[in-house]
Amino acid sequence: MAETRIHPSAVVDPAAQVGEGCEIGPFCVIGPEVGLGRGVVLKSHVVVAGETLIGDETVVFPFASLGEVPQDLKFRGERTRLEIGARNRIREYVTMNPGTEGGGGVTRIGDDGLFMAGSHVAHDCQIGNRVILVNNASVAGHCVLEDDVIVGGLSGVHQFVRIGRGAMIGAVTMVTADVIPFGLVQGPRGHLDGLNLVGLKRRGASREEIHALRDMLAQLGQGSFRDTARHLAEAENGPMVREVLDFILGPSDRSFLAPHP
């Protein structure tokens, strides 16, 4: 592992924990409760504040702000934190806030994500692995984005929304309710527009699994998602269908995005 390099113009608090092989570029500011894993790269003009942990080999581009106080009027300075996993790419002007006392106290970002320029992750969000936020996408507080979710550019996700594994949100889309795993959401007032077929095929879903998901989705569209899911759950189902049904029947503070009438 290469030695750690810190530019002379960077301000790194002596109490910060900086791992082996890190690169901290010009005009970065690193607070006393920050922990950087091995090989983390902060390009330049990056601010990392609060109790923020950044995992190994994550690269942060200029003017990102990580761990500054939540944009929540109820926040009163309580001790909370931001945890960012390994091998993430955090592009220019990205903002990520720590948790709040009322939301569990921790914002978590998984591994291998791509957060494009200007995207935002608010307080208390739980973000899975390999998640992509395209330019200027915003995720409000308390949201859950499971693994392999993609949120298109200029899209917004309402607070407390859950987005299931492998779902795709199109560009310029407002997501106000939960999105089932493998769903495709489009339109200014987001609606469920079928399955994320490209994502399913990339992950090796078989033709039979895709047909089963389509059949399930057709039945869900005929009535209440929860009532229909309870009925479908009584039958034998493959793992992908079971995952969707379990998601629908799980705890939630929101309704579900339904197919466009």
Curated annotation (Swiss-Prot):
HAMAP family: LpxA. PROSITE patterns: HEXAPEP_TRANSFERASES (PS00101). It comes from the Bacteria. Involved in the biosynthesis of lipid A, a phosphorylated glycolipid that anchors the lipopolysaccharide to the outer membrane of the cell. It comes from Paracoccus denitrificans (strain Pd 1222). This is Acyl-[acyl-carrier-protein]--UDP-N-acetylglucosamine O-acyltransferase. The keyword Secreted does not apply. Coiled coil: none annotated. Pathway: Glycolipid biosynthesis; lipid IV(A) biosynthesis; lipid IV(A) from (3R)-3-hydroxytetradecanoyl-[acyl-carrier-protein] and UDP-N-acetyl-alpha-D-glucosamine: step 1/6.
